[in-house]
């Protein structure tokens, strides 16, 4: 078993710096009409805004969020990337860790932010609520004792101090693709017809954006033929089942990142809470320095563009070393299904523009409209080289191995191994304490039948199945994991050790400095594989799922029971909450 000696030593080093306070927030969730990108539609709001309010805390603080559900439907709130160390019932997953909040119901989430820092976010976890606006940013300020990688960026003490100043005043931007219709409507259409909801109206930054209508010639030159006026690839029989999608340009406000006087660097946290599109981040005429991923410091990468997948966070520093003025921040889709780009504005201190002026500046981009770099001399972020700073190698061996074969098992049905995680399970008594709610998508043991005990190390091997040509951005609740290997051609071995000893695959794995994330990417091609390794540091019922909305909604989810032999007693008030007495339907499948 692997003991978290590194975390323990860091906590001892912190000493009295972990004196904490309680950060209290009140959230009221409503559905309101909104037109952030110029097209009106119902949106889930938190305190009248989407994204919701920023939650800020220091390491060691307790966060308390009172949530008032004023919707006509059930809901929960998940704290994406946050370790639910002491109170696993506050992870916000209906049917797994809690009963959902009924309409006009309330619930208070309480958790302590321990052993982590940086950029996170919260979002609804009942159905596709996060894709319809129920989301917001979180920032856990890194403790003063934590090492920073700034001296690897510049040997100037002045620059290093400016980077520290930027870190203390970060910008937070929730980025996402944005559809013309509510996502539950689009998912029902997907279930019945197989038409994927990939055609977005806009890419929004903090809920702001525009629909840009490009010429057919430009769209075809960067994306190829067979596209509509929104740049979307048309799907077979799409015109029979979905509303016609015609590009209608809008002129709404853009998000402005106004640098303060005296600041020579700025820090921006990009938080991807979208539904379908992987996004490419770039700032016109500026190199960007990637300094953190999924909250934690990394060895810096100085690049011209950085990709950010669904559920991920990428934190960058930008040196304000160009002529003062406005520069476009571009967030561009990397998915082949649609040619689409969103814009924000980086504004230098003392810019002559008025505070409300938000026209896209005519600055030089680093990327084409399809997200590719305009020159092979430019640098793209390499996500597999985002090594943690300071170095934190993974455990050398694992105690358990789980293997998941990703496959499409029918129209509108995705599975990890045996079958989809049915949507009705979010209305069952939570499986955290109710064993009868645990189905074939609940995993209590590894491939050898051993239970995953507290303190043990787990490998998860993902393999892309037959007839699958779509990538999968997975998210692991409650743990960060080292992404120790990726490859092609399938993974026929039962364990990583077998792959190395019997398959000669040693060069396919990194046990020295792999990235550590709360998710991973499984490649697009049949036979692609990814292996992650993590340690079970506290008991939990942890969901593992694809964050692409139609995969998530169509059942590509499992629940892992980790360290449950050490589980704290579930409070009686969790079990006694008002809830629906639900009997599963006869139909077996997602979105029931």
Swiss-Prot record:
Key word Oxidoreductase present: yes
Residue span(s) of domain Plastocyanin-like: 32-142, 173-350, 445-563
Single GO cellular component term: cell surface
Signal peptide: 1-19
Disulphide-bridged cysteine pairs: none
Main location: other
The protein's annotated pathway: Pigment biosynthesis; melanin biosynthesis
Descriptive protein name: Laccase PFICI_06862
Residues given in the record as Cu cation 2 binding sites: 80, 123
Species of origin: Pestalotiopsis fici (strain W106-1 / CGMCC3.15140)
